[in-house]
């Protein structure tokens, strides 16, 4: 909120009309999950009124309000999601997101020095990259862009350049076997050994975890032997204690024989629309 006010003052000093807004002033409505809230709706009327008066609206990008008027925060990358949601509501032709990098790269340039910048990438591929650990654009921002058909361009705040365009369809990328590689560290693998292989078991395990706003990533269920199976899934390390408590509570209902926890694992993912049509 302070930053948006300061930016507004800086623009005024340059003779540019601007006005800062908090989430409550704009009515960015979210779920009530503090620090992990999800945007439900954005009231675009006030934004459009300001734009019609040739004034630049500057909006805090990581906040929201519940139906009851309580302030929430959107978590890491929440400003990306806010920007795309607002762009969708005001029918913008495109949403530009300025970051500390020059665009979307084939992999993390901080890890691989010869990573190449992509001129364009499809929404589908960007969703996969973001979901598998690429941190340039937040996953929910790409989901909004895909749902409301808002092209997104990722640009550098520090360097001039064309950045990377995230579009609904990019003909030049369709034949690319692999368009990017993403990695996620600090993952935890949970394995419930010898779970009853009966309908509804997965829901009984994952349902309470979902209600706790924990995102489950990889899910693997082994082939059943004598009516028993091993159920494995991964979550972020920051959610480890929450998941442990949940599995302890439902142990008698699920009736698993043993809980095996493997912390500090990493995942590497290859993403590319071209792999869909490739064998092997």
Language model segments and positions:
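Glycine-rich beta-alpha junction loops
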Residues: 101-103, 148-152, 156-161, 196, ...
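Nucleotide/pyrophosphate-binding catalytic subdomain
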Residues: 1-142, 222, 234, 260
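Conserved beta-strand termini and adjacent loop/short-helix elements that scaffold enzyme active sites
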Residues: 21-23, 155-157, 219
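Short hydrophobic alpha-helical runs that function as membrane-insertion/retention elements
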Residues: 94-98, 152-154, 217
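Conserved dinucleotide-binding and phosphotransfer motif residues
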Residues: 14, 148, 212
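A conserved regulatory-domain signal marking ACT and ACT-like small-molecule sensing domains
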Residues: 163-280
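Phosphate/diphosphate-binding glycine-rich loops and adjacent basic-rich segments that engage nucleotide
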Residues: 59-60, 92, 128-186
């Amino acid at each position: 909120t302070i930053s948006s006010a300061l930016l507004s003052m800086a623009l005024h000093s340059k003779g540019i009309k601007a006005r800062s807004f908090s989430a409550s002033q704009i009515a960015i409505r979210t779920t009530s999950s503090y620090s992990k809230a999800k945007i439900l709706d954005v009231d675009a009327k006030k934004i459009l009124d300001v734009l019609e008066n040739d004034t630049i609206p500057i909006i805090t990008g990581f906040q929201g309000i519940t139906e009851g008027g309580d302030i929430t925060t959107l978590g890491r990358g929440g400003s990306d999601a806010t920007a795309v949601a607002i762009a969708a509501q005001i029918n913008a032709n495109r949403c530009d997101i300025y970051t500390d990098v020059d665009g979307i790269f084939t992999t993390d340039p901080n890890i691989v020095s010869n990573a190449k910048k992509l001129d364009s990438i499809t929404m589908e591929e960007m969703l996969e990259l973001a979901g598998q650990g690429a941190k340039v654009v937040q996953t929910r921002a790409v989901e909004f862009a895909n749902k409301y058909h808002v092209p997104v361009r990722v640009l550098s705040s520090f360097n001039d350049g064309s950045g990377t365009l995230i579009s609904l369809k990019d003909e030049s990328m369709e034949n690319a076997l692999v368009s990017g590689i993403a990695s996620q560290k600090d993952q935890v693998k949970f394995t419930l050994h010898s779970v009853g292989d009966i309908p509804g078991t997965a829901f009984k395990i994952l349902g309470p975890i979902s209600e706790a706003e924990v995102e489950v990533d990889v899910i693997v269920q082994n082939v059943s032997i004598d009516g028993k199976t091993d159920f494995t899934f991964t979550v972020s390390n920051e959610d480890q204690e929450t998941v442990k408590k949940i599995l302890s509570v439902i142990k008698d209902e699920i009736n698993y024989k043993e809980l095996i926890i493997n912390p500090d694992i990493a995942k590497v993912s290859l993403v590319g629309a071209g792999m869909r049509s490739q064998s092997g």
